[in-house]
């Protein structure tokens, strides 16, 4: 009587991955309840942009979060992983504009309403596409609580926060310098700027001193911006320019009089040491302008053409104007020289256009008072970065924070909740659309045309997704969340903003830990990009190798904060591991007998191999649980891999095969139960990283839980700890490996059995005696005996030395003696090199004096061991000769 479902002969993830995911969802395993008797564990999924398909970075993000959430679910937490997507204001708008352009349409001709209809169509399609990709990866997220940053409930949260900030005096409208994209005609955040190396020029220009026959020479990479110059700055310590400070210069071509100001900002060694100051078109110049009360002259229109009031240059494109200005400077004798200069140019990451720093009227959030408690929270350990080094980046940004420009001149996004009375000019800030002006009662109101920066709504993600500002059970139970998993590239733009938004709106930090991961690079370490054509579609990988293999490769290759390299052979190796687990599980299930198992279920008359594997498995439970707590997910996965592949599959299963095929029913029953227990625990520990294969096998095992996904995480049992059995088995395994190696080197086939004679110290003998029967099966021994002295070994015996014993086998009738001497000579050379290394270390006074006593002693023990091994090898060579 077997009573176990037979598994398919071959591992084929396509046969069960989709089926299992559908079943998980139908059963509601990923939908936690509000249960005050259980602890919650919450992760908010960083919402991917709805601009296209997911890439390997998203796959890594999902795999790490899913590992954490699955482990916590099994550990008895009400584990919520809340998924969603980001509307990605400018990125989506640019993509949809490109789409309608293919139809011969443009945004302005369509009008706001029609264009937004198209964006919503796009949104619907891409949200479903993203969810489909995530489900393929096996994410155990609760899609019943799914959110989108443009949902009605999130829009309500956005408006509430905007009004609250405004009423608290933290939101204001003002003219400040910001990044401007002339193509998209909107302000941009620093996160949307991509810097590219450009071969440009330094134009050296004379600025004449008023009323004198002298000039100051400046150097600029943007000569067209001289139209907005309002000063030239020099360093007050620069002797070359001291006499000019306070004098007026005459701006070439325009004749505008501008002062020479002294400012420490100027680097005396760079360029000419004199800097033209254009406060309206350079962030550094803007600050200099504020310090010296300089006029801000905006010389560009929103589309990058020159404004009216600049003579013949007005109406020209900025680069057309550059050529004309340089030509005129040359003609009028102001151009001194042109030097080649390589510099970084800021471009809009969505449209590729070169951005212009420009003073414009925008809405801003005052950051100083919001940043302070957010800095203190991390310093106090309320939110911890993993790895810790990333808190320095966080502090650096927060301590030097500038006011945040939150308005964007776009159509797709959260419309700014501000209305202007067209009759009296009153500004009305309101959560709901006002019917009349609060000042003059006029109904002639117009809403601000701008939308909010995408990060404004993303900053509210940890609590807006739980229904805030409305009070409800979810918000009370699942907030604050536990862990945020994200890449190091958005610490400033997203993580920091969530921290201060959480403290400001909820009174506490939004998450306890921030797990930072690196980028997924190609095999050569290059960043994956369209231009390099080295991107990898996770769905293609899943189609070829299965989701479990991809997840395993991404997680085992990962350490917090570090980049990883994607290599196909690593995914292939992960698939081979899955295949190994599949075949081993199938073998176990084919041989288990439920009736015999039940009969001997509580019997603990374990063999040495049983005690060893139970002790090792028990240690693994404690180690892996500890690794997960420390966010060492890659280490945890590697440990499970090593145990399952080496100790369970390669050794334990082989060690118990004679029992399984034997006649002793009681021994069988005990072995069956150990096999079942260890396989189940191994699958449970592997489940967070390889959920599909572990679930499929678990269903065939017929475990006590409906699904492995909701099974109880294994616990450490002190009674199973058995160091004696572990030490004994380790010595036996090393000896068997050594015998196998010798036989392989000498080309002795398994069919040719040989006696094995063991010489060992008294303290090790018991271990070998306990496991001597294992040598017959796994070391192809015809018999095993123990020698009182090495002299008892037959002259024609080949030897092998391990840490615990010297093994002799009369193989000379079966081997080539010359080759054996050659092998031992190589072993002798290796041991001599090791002895030399240890002696060198122990003769180093610095090492002996500074290293801990235990480390020095360990080296001495090693040295003695190697010397004994060398002696034994030399004896065998002499005997053979």
Swiss-Prot record:
Catalysed reactions listed for this entry: tRNA(Val) + L-valine + ATP = L-valyl-tRNA(Val) + AMP + diphosphate
Annotated GO CC locations: cytosol
Residue span of motif 'HIGH' region: 48-58
Motif extent ('KMSKS' region): 527-531
One MF term in the entry's GO annotations: ATP binding
Keywords, in A-Z order: Aminoacyl-tRNA synthetase, ATP-binding, Coiled coil, Cytoplasm, Ligase, Nucleotide-binding, Protein biosynthesis
Gene3D superfamilies listed in its UniProt record: HUPs, Isoleucyl-tRNA Synthetase, Domain 1, Valyl-tRNA synthetase, C-terminal domain
E.C. number(s) listed in UniProt: 6.1.1.9
First-listed, main subcellular location of the protein, grouped into a coarse class: cytoplasm
Compartments, record wording: Cytoplasm
Residues reported in the UniProt entry to bind ATP: 530
Oligomer status and interactors: Monomer.
PANTHER family the UniProt entry points to: VALINE--TRNA LIGASE, CHLOROPLASTIC_MITOCHONDRIAL 2, VALYL-TRNA SYNTHETASES
Family listed: Belongs to the class-I aminoacyl-tRNA synthetase family. ValS type 1 subfamily.
The protein's role, per its UniProt record: Catalyzes the attachment of valine to tRNA(Val). As ValRS can inadvertently accommodate and process structurally similar amino acids such as threonine, to avoid such errors, it has a 'posttransfer' editing activity that hydrolyzes mischarged Thr-tRNA(Val) in a tRNA-dependent manner.
Domain notes: ValRS has two distinct active sites: one for aminoacylation and one for editing. The misactivated threonine is translocated from the active site to the editing site.
Protein name as it appears in the record: Valine--tRNA ligase
Gene: valS
């Amino acid at each position: 009587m077997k009573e176990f479902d037979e598994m398919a002969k071959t591992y084929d993830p396509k046969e069960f991955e989709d089926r299992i995911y559908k079943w998980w969802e139908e059963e509601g395993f990923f939908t936690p309840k509000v249960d005050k008797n259980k602890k919650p564990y919450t992760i908010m999924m960083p919402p991917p942009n709805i601009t296209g398909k997911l890439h390997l970075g998203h796959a890594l993000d999902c795999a790490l979060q899913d590992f954490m959430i699955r482990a916590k679910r099994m550990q008895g937490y009400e584990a919520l992983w809340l998924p969603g997507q980001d509307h990605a204001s400018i990125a989506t708008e640019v993509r949809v504009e490109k789409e309608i352009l293919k139809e011969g349409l443009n945004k302005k001709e369509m009008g706001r309403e029609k264009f937004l209809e198209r964006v919503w169509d796009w949104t619907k399609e891409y949200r479903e596409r993203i969810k489909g990709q995530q489900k393929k990866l096996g994410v155990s997220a609760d899609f019943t609580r799914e959110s989108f940053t443009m949902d009605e409930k999130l829009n309500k949260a956005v408006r509430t926060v905007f009004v609250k900030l405004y009423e608290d005096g933290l939101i204001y409208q003002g003219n400040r310098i910001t990044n401007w994209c002339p193509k998209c005609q909107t302000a941009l955040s620093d996160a949307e700027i991509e810097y590219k190396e450009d071969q440009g020029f330094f134009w050296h220009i004379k600025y004449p001193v008023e009323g004198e026959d002298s000039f100051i020479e400046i150097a600029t990479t943007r000569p067209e911006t001289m139209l907005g110059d309002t000063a030239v700055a020099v360093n007050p310590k620069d002797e070359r320019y001291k006499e000019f400070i306070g004098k007026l210069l005459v701006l070439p071509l325009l004749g505008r009089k501008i002062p020479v100001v002294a400012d420490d900002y100027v680097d005396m060694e760079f360029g000419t040491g004199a800097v033209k100051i254009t406060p309206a078109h350079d962030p550094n110049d803007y600050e200099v302008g504020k310090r010296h009360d300089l006029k801000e002259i905006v010389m560009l229109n929103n589309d990058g053409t020159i404004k009216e009031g600049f003579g013949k240059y007005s109406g020209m494109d900025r680069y057309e104007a550059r050529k004309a200005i340089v030509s005129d400077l040359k003609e009028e004798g102001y151009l001194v020289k042109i030097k080649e200069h390589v510099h970084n140019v800021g471009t809009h990451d969505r449209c590729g256009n070169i951005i212009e720093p420009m003073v414009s009227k925008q809405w801003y959030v005052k950051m100083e008072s919001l940043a302070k408690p957010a800095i203190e929270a991390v310093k106090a350990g309320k939110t911890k970065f993993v790895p810790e080094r990333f808190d320095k980046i966080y502090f650096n940004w927060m301590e030097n924070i500038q006011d945040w420009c939150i308005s964007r001149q776009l159509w797709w996004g959260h419309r700014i909740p501000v209305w202007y009375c067209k009759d009296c000019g009153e500004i009305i800030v309101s959560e709901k659309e006002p019917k009349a002006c609060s000042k003059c009662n006029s109904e002639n109101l117009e809403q601000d045309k701008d939308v909010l920066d995408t990060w404004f709504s993303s900053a509210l993600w940890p609590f807006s997704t739980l229904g805030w500002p409305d009070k409800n059970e979810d918000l009370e139970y699942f907030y604050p969340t536990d862990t945020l998993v994200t890449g190091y590239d958005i610490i400033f733009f997203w993580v920091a903003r969530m921290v201060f938004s959480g403290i400001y709106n909820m009174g506490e930090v939004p998450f306890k830990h921030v797990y930072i991961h690196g980028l997924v690079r190609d095999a050569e370490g290059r960043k994956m990009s369209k231009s390099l054509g080295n991107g990898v579609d996770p769905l293609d990988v899943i189609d070829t190798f299965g989701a479990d293999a991809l997840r395993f490769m991404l997680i085992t290759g990962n350490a917090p904060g570090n980049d990883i390299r994607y290599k196909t052979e690593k995914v292939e190796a992960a698939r081979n591991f899955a295949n190994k687990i599949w075949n081993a599980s199938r073998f176990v299930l084919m041989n288990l007998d439920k009736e015999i198992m039940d009969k001997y279920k509580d019997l603990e008359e374990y063999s040495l191999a049983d005690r060893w594997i139970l002790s090792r498995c028990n240690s693994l439970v404690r180690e892996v649980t500890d690794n997960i707590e420390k966010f060492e997910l890659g280490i945890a996965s590697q440990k499970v891999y090593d145990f399952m592949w080496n100790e369970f599959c390669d050794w334990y299963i082989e060690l118990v095969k004679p029992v399984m095929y034997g006649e002793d029913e009681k021994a069988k029953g005990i072995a069956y139960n150990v096999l079942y227990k260890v396989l189940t625990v191994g699958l449970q520990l592997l489940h967070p990283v390889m959920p599909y294969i572990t679930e499929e096998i678990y269903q065939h095992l017929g475990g006590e839980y409906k699904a492995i996904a909701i099974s109880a995480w294994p616990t450490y049992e002190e009674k199973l700890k058995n160091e004696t059995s572990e030490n004994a088995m380790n010595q036996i395994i090393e000896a068997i490996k050594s015998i196998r190696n010798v036989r392989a080197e000498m080309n002795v086939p398994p069919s040719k059995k040989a006696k094995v004679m063991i010489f060992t110290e008294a303290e090790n003998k018991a271990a070998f005696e306990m496991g001597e029967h294992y040598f017959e099966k796994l070391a192809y021994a015809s018999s095993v005996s123990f020698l009182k002295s090495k002299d008892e070994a037959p002259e024609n015996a080949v030897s092998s030395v391990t840490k615990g014993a010297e093994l002799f086998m009369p193989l000379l009738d079966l081997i080539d003696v010359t080759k054996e001497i050659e092998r031992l000579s190589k072993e002798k050379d290796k041991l001599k090199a090791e002895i030399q290394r240890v002696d060198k270390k122990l003769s180093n006074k610095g090492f002996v004096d500074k290293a801990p006593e235990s480390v020095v002693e360990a080296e001495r023990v090693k040295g003695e061991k190697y010397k004994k091994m060398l002696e034994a090898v030399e004896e065998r060579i002499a005997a053979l000769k």
